[in-house]
């Protein structure tokens, strides 16, 4: 395992290099890209990052395109909610 501390976490490997504010930004990205996400197809927390923007479920094998560091980008969430709202308006 690489170097880490309780406070620095995953960016402990960088030591004192690059500055505190940059390490905080990197920590946010690295924690989100290494975490598991919920699979919409099988309903399990098994989606992991395969490459930049490619997310795959370890359980059902489905592959989904998403953001570089998180599975869902902010703009994708906005578009999805807008489409759902418009669909509900046309049905009602």
Swiss-Prot record:
Any GO CC annotation of this UniProt entry: ribonucleoprotein complex
Any one biological process term the GO annotation gives: translation
The keyword Cell cycle is annotated on this UniProt entry: no
Zinc finger annotations (C4-type) as residue ranges: 39-60
InterPro entries: Ribosomal_eL37/eL43 (IPR011331), Ribosomal_eL43 (IPR002674), Ribosomal_zn-bd (IPR011332)
A molecular function GO annotation: zinc ion binding
PANTHER family found in the cross-reference section: 60S RIBOSOMAL PROTEIN L37A-2, LARGE RIBOSOMAL SUBUNIT PROTEIN EL43Y
HAMAP family associated with the record: Ribosomal_eL43
Name listed for the protein in its UniProt record: Large ribosomal subunit protein eL43z
Protein species of origin: Oryza sativa subsp. japonica
């Amino acid at each position: 395992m690489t170097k880490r501390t309780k406070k620095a976490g995953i960016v402990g490997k960088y030591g004192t290099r690059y500055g505190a504010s940059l390490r905080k930004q990197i920590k946010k990205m690295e924690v989100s890209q290494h975490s598991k996400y919920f699979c919409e197809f099988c309903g399990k927390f098994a989606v992991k990052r395969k490459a930049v923007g490619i997310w795959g479920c370890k359980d059902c094998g489905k592959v989904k395109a998403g953001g570089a560091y998180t599975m869902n980008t902010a703009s994708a969430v906005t578009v999805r909610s807008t489409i759902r709202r418009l669909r509900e308006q046309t049905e009602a």
